[in-house]
Swiss-Prot record:
Belongs to the Psb30/Ycf12 family. It comes from Euglena mutabilis. This is Photosystem II reaction center protein Psb30. It holds the Pfam family PSII_Ycf12. One of its GO terms (biological process) is photosynthesis. Keywords: Chloroplast, Membrane, Photosynthesis, Photosystem II, Plastid, Thylakoid, Transmembrane, Transmembrane helix. The gene is psb30.
Length: 33
């Protein structure tokens, strides 16, 4: 297994999961304010 490939896949999944999470957090914070 290529380490570079694993890193790329890991970062991709991280962005796909973290993206919506960050947006939701920001949305909730704005809603609370």
């Amino acid at each position: 297994m290529n380490i570079e490939l694993i890193v790329q896949l890991g970062s991709l999944t991280l962005i796909t999961i973290a993206g919506p999470l960050i947006v939701a957090l920001l949305f909730l914070r704005q809603g609370n304010l």
